[in-house]
Amino acid sequence: MKIHEYQGKQLFARYGVPVPKGEPAFQASEVAPIADRLIAQTGNPVVVVKAQIHAGGRGKGGGVKVAKGGSAEATALAEKILGMQLVTKQTGPEGQKVRRLYIEQGLDIARELYFAMLVDRERRRIAVIASTEGGMDIEEVAHSTPEKIYKLFIDPVLGLAPYQGRQLAIALGLTAKETQRQFLKLVASLYACFTAEDCSLLEINPLVVTGAGDVFALDAKVSFDDNAEFRHADWNGMRDVDEEDPVELQAKRAGLSYVSLDGDIGCLVNGAGLAMATMDIILHYGGKPANFLDVGGGASQEQVKTAFQIILRSERVRGIFVNIFGGIMRCDVVAAGVIAAAKELGLKVPLVVRLEGTNVEAGRKLLDESGLTIQSASSMADGAQKIVAATRGGKAGA
């Protein structure tokens, strides 16, 4: 789950991470009072108007503007940004509509750095990544000047060691005593935030050093681990459904695990491991999966029908492969759901079904007697070849 920059900064502030003063705005009419308050509090006539979307690269896309002419200029900029379709490298060509703004005090920036924490699954550690090249696309930095990226890994038992923070400060050229002290405190606070809030990503680009030597998080990109949602009741209040995939939201509400992909073969599977294996075997035989969809071990007939509705919301889907291994899940329940969905939705794309396990014979009988054009598969490989052939004009690769 992602949150907006202003929400990330509110979270940072709770953990003692220094952030510039700022307030969110949802209408252009709210901007002038906010700008006036910031100018009065800081004595600085410069404020920054920032589009709030769940994507990076907002500045290059025209979503971040500096107002040096007080609240009137800030309001004029807000009117241009609010409602715009902001296109960045992370939104795709369709862009994302701007519905929220963050109005923030201007700072005297001397240096821009990059800082991030994320889960390194291979090492089973929290990885800290930093660079002297803040404000830039970190992927470009990694490609062109990898020597400017510094990494360290935090032992999950020992936690963040003080020497690691000092090593990072030295690598980033933060040698001034007070600046280094602030940086070490910031790193410790961010680590506390990352672990306590069950983050999967915490990124600040840029992390700035002001002319006075103070350190501030000028950006805040935060993602939470969805698996920890059960112990964070406050997450619901931070969720912005306008920024989320409506199909994935529908799946979540139905108790289904769904991720949209860019292929054209819909997949309906029970179990995450089997779902991934199904996608792999479709690719092996020359097809491209349109989604990851795990209906779980005890899905009802209604959930199976909802799963079909979700798959068919994508106009790219040219065929569907149902791959079920029934343990707790009963094959006859799946078959009944498949039949109900196909009839109700007027299914027009090829459908291949492979059933194994509990009540498999009853399930196959239901499919055979349904009167629908459903291809039965004897194995996962057989099913993958059949659906690829059906969507590729009768040919499947080996």
Curated annotation (Swiss-Prot):
Annotated metabolic or biological route of this protein: Carbohydrate metabolism; tricarboxylic acid cycle; succinate from succinyl-CoA (ligase route): step 1/1
GO molecular function: ATP binding; magnesium ion binding; succinate-CoA ligase (ADP-forming) activity; succinate-CoA ligase (GDP-forming) activity
InterPro entries: ATP-grasp, ATP-grasp_succ-CoA_synth-type, ATP_grasp_subdomain_1, Succ-CoA_synthase_bsu_CS, SUCC_ACL_C, Succ_CoA_ligase-like_bsu, Succinyl-CoA_synth-like
This protein's UniProt keywords: ATP-binding, Ligase, Magnesium, Metal-binding, Nucleotide-binding, Tricarboxylic acid cycle
EC number(s) given by UniProt: 6.2.1.5
Boundaries of every ATP-grasp domain copy: 9-250
Gene3D superfamilies per UniProt: ATP-grasp fold, A domain (3.30.1490.20), ATP-grasp fold, B domain (3.30.470.20), Succinyl-CoA synthetase domains (3.40.50.261)
Cofactor mode of binding and number, as noted: Binds 1 Mg(2+) ion per subunit.
Subunit structure: Heterotetramer of two alpha and two beta subunits.
Entries under PANTHER family matching the protein: SUCCINATE--COA LIGASE [GDP-FORMING] SUBUNIT BETA, MITOCHONDRIAL, SUCCINYL-COA SYNTHETASE BETA CHAIN
Name this polypeptide is given: Succinate--CoA ligase [ADP-forming] subunit beta
Gene: sucC
